[in-house]
């Protein structure tokens, strides 16, 4: 209900990403090797621009992402609405091929989750994120672009 949750127009995106990376890395570090997944894929979905982080700065998050990619083979996927997702992802060290713009509505969000579901089905089979992972998201976004 509106009493429990309400939109405030704030996105602490860098804090969310930084905390997630640290928590997942800590879990991996405290696990026996056989319990650490062969692939780690971090999916970032936002409907707004960073404007509220207090703990993490852009350069810190970028360094964290680059370290996990280089040292541990993590993959990062970024989906953003109401922003230039390709540019924002790039500023964090996420390649344009792993970033997509989407419409923040029912169809756009559903399209995201279908694409992510297919992506994880492939990753679970031992594959990397496919180059065409965002094909349907791009098709939807471009067909309804204003």
Residue ranges of predicted features:
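Acidic, low-complexity intrinsically disordered regions
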Residues: 1-146
């Amino acid at each position: 209900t509106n009493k429990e949750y309400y939109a405030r127009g704030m996105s602490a995106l860098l804090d969310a990403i930084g905390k997630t990376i640290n928590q997942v890395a800590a879990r991996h570090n405290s696990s026996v090797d056989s319990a650490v997944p062969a692939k780690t894929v971090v999916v970032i979905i936002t409907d707004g621009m960073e404007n509220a982080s207090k703990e993490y700065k852009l350069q810190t998050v970028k360094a964290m992402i680059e370290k996990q990619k280089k040292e541990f083979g993590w993959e990062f996927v970024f989906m953003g609405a109401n922003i230039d997702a390709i540019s924002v992802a790039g500023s964090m060290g996420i390649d344009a091929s792993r970033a997509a713009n989407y419409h923040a509505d029912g169809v756009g969000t559903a399209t995201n989750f279908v694409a992510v579901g297919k992506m994880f089905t492939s990753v679970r089979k031992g594959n990397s994120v496919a180059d065409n992972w965002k094909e349907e998201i791009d098709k939807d976004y471009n067909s309804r672009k204003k």
